[in-house]
Structure formats: structure tokens, C-alpha cells
Amino acid sequence: MAIIIGIDPGSRMTGYGILQQTGDKLTYIDSGTIRTDTKEMPERLKRIFNGLTRITQHHLKYADEPIYTAIEQVFMAENPDSALKLGQARGAAIAAMVALDLEVSEYTARQIKQAVCGYGAAAKEQVQDMVCRILTLDFVPQQDAADGLACAICHAHSSHSMNKLILNSAMRGRGASKKKGRWRLTEEDLGNLR
């Protein structure tokens, strides 16, 4: 079991989504946005940092399982000023997570869309719709919050796939045997996995 916090950074609005992963099952916990309505960039960064810190600390209090964070990588915008502001907002979000001793994984927008929609160039509305379907939500989250949830879903799929690869590699190197296309663990392997 794990808690995954997905972050969609933005200089005016940062979206976040929080899920619980239990094996293949994803359960919605929370989502929302941190709005930075001020014109001053340092104040915006402070609001992003403080908002994500407060939200994460709240969930850290109640979590018995490990917490992982995932954030969308910066894309190269046509406007260099926009790309710099987005990079700064992303930096504030990463700093907030690292200050809480949380590991941060990064994914491109294409990777996130591919994981959620099966198509790396999906529109924002498609991502929003698929997030609702995957998590069986009875409401539609705001787009930036849906993007945060999509980032968390992407991390869940990536980490679950990676865990399977690691387990398969460990079994191949040990006394496990393959029977009818499946790996059979020895008693020693089972003991090492506990």
C-alpha cells in the first residue's frame, strides 16, 4: 500500500491529486488547486510551497503507508518567459516535497497522457474524463486537479510495473523455476520477499 501525490505545477494555479494504491487498485483521497492570484512571482512561489507543504503534512499525519510524489516535467513553451515561470513554480513544488523528505518522480506530459488515456497527445478534456473513469469518481475535478490525479495515476502504473520487473528479475537470479509461463517461487524466495 502507498499514498501517491501527483502535482501539476503552474505559476497561477497548481493542481494536486492524492491517491492510495493497493496492488492494482487506486482509491481517490483528495484533489484540488492552489491558486496564486498575486502578481509578484516570489509571493506566488511562496503560496505554492506553503500550500503543498500544508496539504502534504495533513496527509502525512494520517498515513501509515509510504508516501510518494510525482510531478509533471516542464515542457518548452513558445514563450520563454512562460517556461521560466513554470519552471520556478515546479521548483517550489519540488522543494516543498523534498523539504518533507519525500522522493519526487518526474514524468513528461506525454507519459502521463499515455498512462491515463493510452494516447500521448490526448486533449485535457480526455484526460479529465479518463481520470473520472479510472477512479470511478461521481464528480468531475477541475482540470488542473485532474492533471494532478493523472500524474499520480501515471506514477502508480510506472511503480507497479517496475515492482513486477524487479520481482521477476529477483526470481530469475534465485532458485525459482518457470512452469507454464509463470514463475514458481522456492521456499527460500518466499522467505526473502517477506
Curated annotation (Swiss-Prot):
Protein EC: 3.1.21.10
MF annotations from Gene Ontology: crossover junction DNA endonuclease activity; DNA binding; magnesium ion binding
Gene3D superfamilies: Ribonuclease H-like superfamily/Ribonuclease H (3.30.420.10)
Residues noted as binding Mg(2+) 2 in the record, renumbered to the chain: 72
The keyword DNA-binding is annotated on this UniProt entry: yes
Catalytic residues, chain numbering: 8, 72, 144
Annotated cofactor note: Binds 2 Mg(2+) ion per subunit.
A GO BP annotation: DNA repair
CC cofactor: Mg(2+)
Record function comment: The RuvA-RuvB-RuvC complex processes Holliday junction (HJ) DNA during genetic recombination and DNA repair. Endonuclease that resolves HJ intermediates. Cleaves cruciform DNA by making single-stranded nicks across the HJ at symmetrical positions within the homologous arms, yielding a 5'-phosphate and a 3'-hydroxyl group; requires a central core of homology in the junction. The consensus cleavage sequence is 5'-(A/T)TT(C/G)-3'. Cleavage occurs on the 3'-side of the TT dinucleotide at the point of strand exchange.
Membership in a protein family: Belongs to the RuvC family.
Complex formation: Homodimer which binds Holliday junction (HJ) DNA. The HJ becomes 2-fold symmetrical on binding to RuvC with unstacked arms; it has a different conformation from HJ DNA in complex with RuvA. In the full resolvosome a probable DNA-RuvA(4)-RuvB(12)-RuvC(2) complex forms which resolves the HJ.
Name the UniProt record assigns to this protein: Crossover junction endodeoxyribonuclease RuvC
Lineage: Bacteria, Pseudomonadati, Pseudomonadota, Gammaproteobacteria, Moraxellales
Gene: ruvC
